[in-house]
Design a protein with these regions (language model features):
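Short, Gly/Pro- and small/polar-rich lid/capping loops
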Residues: 2-39
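Compositionally biased, non-globular sequence tracts
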Residues: 7-10, 14, 85-86, 146, ...
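Glycine-rich, charged/polar anion/phosphate-binding loops
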Residues: 22-25, 31-34, 52-54, 107, ...
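Glycine-rich, flexible beta-strand/loop modules in the N-terminal catalytic cores of phosphate-handling
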Residues: 28, 33-114, 175, 179-182, ...
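A short glycine/serine-rich beta->alpha loop
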Residues: 86-90, 123-132
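A structural signal for small-residue-enriched, beta-sheet-centric alpha/beta enzyme cores
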Residues: 92, 113-116, 131-135, 141-218
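Generic beta-strand or strand-like secondary-structure segments
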Residues: 96, 100-104, 120, 139, ...
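Glycine- and acidic-rich phosphate- and metal-coordinating loops
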Residues: 102, 112-128
Length: 218
């Protein structure tokens, strides 16, 4: 039964509604206008921001733009994967994730206050153990594994998930992005609500970690 009374200890010792240890290291690289390394358990993503004093043609006069690129290092996973550039095309997964990151960030920024400039966020996965797309934008995943709802799936859980859901939320707890998929079975509206509730808890905790990492700058 899905509900708040579940007492489930997972293979890594976490409770069903517990995030993996999260660490955000700011100014991780020297030359980018902004950067951070985010670690969610064994998942590590390097995010770098680059600023250009111009915007794409479709952007309204006086406004800015935020876009993103996403990739995984060949040995970010247990087996080597080919770089997208070696395949001469962007993988559908990478394209989907970088659109997710761009959309999410644009929803959080006042484009008029940004001015006529473009910020490009490069998200490079150094090591992947589940949740690389949500780590790239400080969102969180939840899923149903063996009919139990779990927050923040690592790879060994994600690979067995019957239902997988990714959420990005703002400071008010409002949804910016939600992606839910039945991997092994269908899921009910009540189950979806429970997974969103778990994600809301996780996003609230991640927001506090972000603010602490920024040292009160924002």
């Amino acid at each position: 039964m899905i509900g708040g009374g579940i007492d489930l200890t997972r293979e890594d010792g976490r409770m069903f509604n517990e995030l993996r240890p999260v660490k955000i290291t700011t100014d991780f690289v020297k030359f980018a206008e902004g950067s951070c390394l985010i670690q969610c358990g064994d998942t590590m993503v390097l995010c770098c921001a680059s600023v250009e004093e111009k915007t794409p043609p479709h952007v309204p006069y006086g406004e800015g733009w935020i876009t993103a690129e996403y990739s995984m290092l060949p040995r970010a996973n247990r087996e080597r994967s080919r770089r997208d550039v070696a395949k001469l095309k962007l993988s559908p997964r990478s394209a989907e994730i970088q659109r997710l990151v761009g959309r999410s960030l644009r929803s959080a920024v006042d484009m008029k206050r940004l001015g006529e400039r473009t910020i490009t966020i490069d998200c490079d996965v150094l090591q992947g153990d589940g949740g690389t797309r949500t780590a790239s934008v400080t969102g969180v995943s939840a899923g149903i594994v063996e009919d139990a709802p779990l927050l923040d799936l690592r790879y060994s859980e994600d690979s067995r998930a019957q239902v997988d859901l990714n959420c990005v939320m703002n400071e008010l707890g409002e949804l910016i992005e939600i992606q839910g998929t039945g991997e092994g079975r269908a899921f009910s509206p009540a189950e979806q609500q429970e997974l969103v509730r778990l994600c809301a808890k996780g996003c609230k905790e991640l927001l506090s970690i972000q603010k602490e990492a920024l040292g009160g700058k924002f």
